[in-house]
Amino acid sequence: MVSMVAACSAPPTADETQPVAGSGEDAEEVETVDPETAEEAADPDSSQAALDEVTAELEGLDPDARRERLIELALEEGGEVSFYGSTNIDDIGPVIDAFEEDTGVSISHYRAGASTVMNRILQESDAGFAGSDVVQINGPEMLILSGEDLLLTLDTPIADDIVEAGRFDDWLAPYVNAFIVGWNTNRVSPEEAPTSYEEAFTNFSGTLAMDVDDFDWFATLVDQYFVGELGMTEEEAVELFKEAASGASVIRGHSLGAELVVAGEYDVHTSLYHHHTARHADGPMDWQPPVEPVVIRPNGVGIVSTTTRPAASLLLVEYMLTDGQQFLADVGRTPGSTAIDAGLPDDIRTIGVDLLKLEEEREKWEGLYEEVVRASGSAVRE
């Protein structure tokens, strides 16, 4: 059973979404925590020490014994864990249900856009409130939490199975988001389908769609592909995106973008999520042969440094990175674990978002992409 955590003075509802720029959904201010009634957060150093004690007790155990002991420790903590995340409930719900059934530990779940979840954790930390034990959001937002010392260092053998781009000291990737060019097959013939970004940007003026929040996709293509591989100047590459936007509609949300392409309202979308196109495989939607290179960006899961439940938190993180991987693969996502053969085909050429560099240059790339979006001259569709 998925329950909702009452983290603020007014509790979130099951379908609440409060994202801000960069999350792919609408902006809304995070509610204010009342520190007089909120549960007191643990000191980060104490939380890390408690987690280290748990991992030390697990050392040397085989996977089954490790899981069994973690369950025992989690139940001793009270058998509950609070989980904040940005993955839609249709995808993450089966993971939560299976976790509760397999472990006997109940989850309080709050779901919103990645930036909203991040801001909520920042705000709760400032208020000294232990709202979330485990967080799972996009890589760029995970790096911000890490930079604020709001994630605990993870020591788990499961990290060895996670793709290299999704391994960090304090978070790991449960899945990878792959940005692909998708088109409506009723409106775009196989001969007309784009074979390059340049064709996608220039051949579908008036019927092209772009996502309003994909500054990381944009930054990666400009820096690594158009400049790094094709030899353009940065100014030339940015101008190419602006020219594309001048003949495009701008949409907020990849789910909506995929739905509108399938409905025939747009011929081509420049940056759909791969798992969304997989869900529309029976409809007039295609993305193959793929426009390459495909930009990939890890999603992350980690333990919040204010947790008072280290064993339950580690149990949930490890479950998401093992048993939970098949559930994510079943809904078309590309698992972070190399032990699961699913998601984006291996023979597709990819380039990864350089999260560390992007974090240093975030203001620059967000500003440039805002200029691209403004070049469309139209209101954002949402």
Where in this protein do the model-derived segments appear?
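Bacterial lipoprotein signal-peptidase II cleavage site
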Residues: 8-25
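Short, polar/charged alpha-helical segment
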Residues: 35, 39-40, 44-47, 64-77, ...
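Extracytoplasmic ligand-binding site segments that recognize negatively charged/polar headgroups
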Residues: 82-96, 108-125, 129-265
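A ligand-binding cleft/hinge motif common to bilobed small-molecule-binding domains
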Residues: 140-144, 262-286
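Short beta-strand->loop
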Residues: 151-158, 170-174, 267-268, 283-295, ...
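A bilobed periplasmic-binding-protein/Venus flytrap-type ligand-binding module shared by bacterial periplasmic
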Residues: 180-187, 222-227, 297-312, 328-331
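Periplasmic-binding protein-like
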Residues: 208-214, 319-341
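Extracellular/periplasmic bilobal clamshell ligand-binding domains
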Residues: 342-382
